[in-house]
């Protein structure tokens, strides 16, 4: 009788065993009978009159309280339905704790390889991890985080329903739009241009996403030194971590066949600030370059030749932006520490990508190949035409490919020809049908209010032919390797977390880069992702349960929490007994 679990007709779960927790929830979403004060009631095991039998359950069923019960509001909402589905999914995968039936096991499922292969490779088809995934293993409760990782689709849907998550995304987007308005302008132009010309942009989604990220990163980092306001946002970066020893890879080989044991770690940097190294004032147009009639290549050559001087007076600060629901920084130190580590990874990646331009070139190509992309395949001509029409620096730069000229990047120039062709001749037809003039977005000068200019397709007629050097991802990897070499050499050892409440940057934390701390964290995170250790739940103290578990989706079904809370109650009773006995002596 003591090991049985009884459920009344209303779905309320009753455990007729010692220390029944009367404010818990079972895995299937039903509730254990709650009390007013959330106390744990001791059912004395040596007194059978204290054990509920079938007659007792029947009396409980007929209490007036149950006549007015109804499903909780949570289960009547989309969020509640997703939560129930997620809990069921996690329970099915992890199984019940055999020592504590009805509660989820807190060890990795047997029969599976490890979280990296289970989640990233097999479930999501992504042969990579993210900086966020490495940093969130220990920022709160590792147990909760891996329950979420294994139910990623449902967890993400739940997150997207939360107001604060949506608010945070909007703040990030508004900051990006303020610094880089050309992105929305480009999207608007492209939409109208395709509709008017009846052109289609048939391009693989993964290729399109990577191409946009690479193009925008080059453009934004170049602008950091030219007409920019000293800021760049949403910049991609990556590095590698060894699958066997969990160490961050400091030196890359040029061939992917020699780096199979290295897993890509990708990230997106929220904010880069170019500032004077001595007075910390933000630098605008630090390179003093006139971009008219210039190209990406010319600007990069100039920056490379003046890098020593730039480095003596300037530095770039990496920041991570965190949004808050109240104007206060987190009270949990592990959350702040996780944010610090996130920026340390970015600093490490930029340092790694600034060692050698040839290695960095191959590193970006390995990144693309691991995503299943063909780095030798010509890029969709319509996509390139929209870049040419909206970005003069790019248009002037790719003339080198059009005419088969070198771009002054030795690895690319020796590697670029290939057997594929890149042909834009079909666009000659546009000159004989439909409109040929369009308003395109331009970068605004301080003394000009014009945001667009009129361009004619006829002015770009020289591009509408077969190019002598195909335009592939290799070209973008080459330009990325140059600008990342420049930026990486300027990255400061001072890192920053920016806290925002609504659109107000109410607090910043500046801290130093710590190589040893980063290496230790990377190894520990890698061990759990690659199967070297099990999950580490939070330390079982009542304070931790009150702090970490209060809003956790798994708080009613977590065996770790349930078992240890019972132990704490037992301990409390024992201490009370000892104190009582001591006082009676």
UniProtKB/Swiss-Prot annotation:
Q: Does the keyword field hold Metal-binding?
A: yes
Q: Which UniProt keywords apply?
A: 4Fe-4S, DNA-binding, Exonuclease, Hydrolase, Iron, Iron-sulfur, Magnesium, Metal-binding, Mitochondrion, Nuclease, Transit peptide
The GO molecular function terms of this record are: 4 iron, 4 sulfur cluster binding; DNA binding; metal ion binding; single-stranded DNA 5'-3' DNA exonuclease activity
The free-text cofactor remark is: Binds 1 [4Fe-4S] cluster.
Gene Ontology biological-process entries? interstrand cross-link repair; mitochondrial genome maintenance
Q: Which residues bind [4Fe-4S] cluster?
A: 141, 549, 552, 558
What residues span the transit peptide?
1-26
Q: Name one GO cellular component term.
A: nucleus
Q: What are the EC numbers?
A: 3.1.-.-
Family of the protein in this entry: Belongs to the EXO5 family.
The record describes its quaternary structure and partners as:
Monomer.
**Name this protein carries in UniProt:** Exonuclease V, mitochondrial
- The record lists the organism as Saccharomyces cerevisiae (strain Lalvin EC1118 / Prise de mousse) (Baker's yeast)
């Amino acid at each position: 009788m003591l090991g049985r679990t009884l459920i009344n007709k209303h779905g309320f779960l009753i455990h007729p065993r010692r220390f029944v927790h009367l404010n818990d929830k079972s895995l299937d979403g039903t509730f254990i009978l709650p009390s007013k004060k959330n106390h744990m009631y001791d059912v004395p095991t040596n007194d059978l009159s204290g054990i509920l039998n079938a007659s007792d359950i029947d009396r409980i069923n007929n209490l007036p309280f149950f006549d007015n019960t109804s499903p909780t509001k949570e289960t009547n909402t989309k969020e509640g339905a997703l939560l129930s589905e997620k809990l069921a999914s996690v329970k099915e995968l992890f199984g019940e704790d055999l020592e504590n039936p009805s509660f989820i096991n807190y060890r990795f499922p047997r029969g599976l390889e490890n979280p990296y292969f289970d989640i990233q490779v097999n479930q999501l088809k992504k042969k990579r991890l993210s900086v966020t995934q490495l940093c969130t293993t220990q920022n709160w409760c590792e147990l909760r985080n891996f329950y979420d990782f294994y139910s990623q689709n449902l967890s993400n849907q739940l997150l997207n329903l939360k107001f604060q998550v949506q608010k945070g995304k909007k703040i990030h987007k508004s900051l990006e739009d303020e610094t880089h308005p050309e992105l929305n302008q480009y999207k608007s132009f492209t939409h109208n241009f395709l509709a008017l010309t009846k052109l289609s942009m048939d391009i693989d989604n993964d290729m399109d996403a990577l191409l946009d990220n690479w193009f925008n990163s080059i453009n934004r980092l170049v602008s950091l030194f030219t007409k920019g306001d000293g800021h760049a946002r949403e910049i991609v970066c990556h590095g590698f971590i060894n699958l066997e020893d969990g160490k961050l890879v400091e030196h890359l080989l040029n061939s992917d066949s020699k780096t199979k044991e290295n897993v890509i770690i990708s990230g997106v940097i929220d904010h880069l600030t170019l500032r004077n190294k001595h007075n910390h004032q933000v630098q605008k147009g630090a390179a003093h370059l006139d971009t008219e009639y210039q190209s990406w290549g010319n600007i990069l050559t100039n920056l490379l030749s003046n890098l020593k001087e730039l480095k003596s007076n300037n530095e770039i600060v990496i920041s991570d932006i965190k949004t808050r629901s109240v104007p206060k920084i987190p009270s949990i130190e592990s959350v702040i520490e996780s944010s610090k580590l996130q920026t340390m990874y970015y600093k490490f990646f930029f340092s790694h990508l600034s060692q050698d331009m040839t290695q960095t070139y191959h590193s970006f190509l390995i990144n693309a190949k691991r995503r299943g992309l063909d780095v030798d395949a010509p890029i969709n001509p319509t996509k390139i035409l929209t870049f040419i029409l909206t970005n003069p620096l790019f248009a002037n730069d790719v003339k080198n490919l059009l005419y088969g000229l070198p771009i002054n990047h030795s690895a690319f120039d020796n590697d670029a020809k290939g057997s594929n062709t890149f042909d834009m001749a079909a666009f000659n037809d546009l000159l004989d049908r439909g409109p040929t003039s369009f308003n395109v977005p331009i970068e605004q000068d301080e003394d000009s209010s014009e945001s667009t200019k009129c361009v004619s397709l006829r002015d770009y007629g020289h591009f509408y032919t077969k190019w002598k050097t195909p335009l592939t991802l290799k070209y973008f990897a080459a330009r990325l390797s140059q600008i990342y070499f420049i930026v990486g050499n300027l990255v400061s050892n001072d890192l920053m977390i920016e806290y925002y409440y609504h659109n107000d940057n109410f607090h910043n934390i500046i801290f130093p880069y710590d190589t040893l701390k980063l290496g230790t964290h990377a190894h520990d995170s890698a061990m759990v992702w690659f199967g070297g250790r099990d999950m580490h739940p939070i330390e079982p103290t009542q304070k931790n349960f009150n702090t970490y578990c209060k809003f956790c989706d798994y708080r009613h079904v977590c065996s770790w929490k349930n078992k240890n809370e019972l132990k704490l109650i037992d301990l409390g009773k024992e201490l009370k007994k000892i104190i009582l006995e001591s006082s009676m002596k």
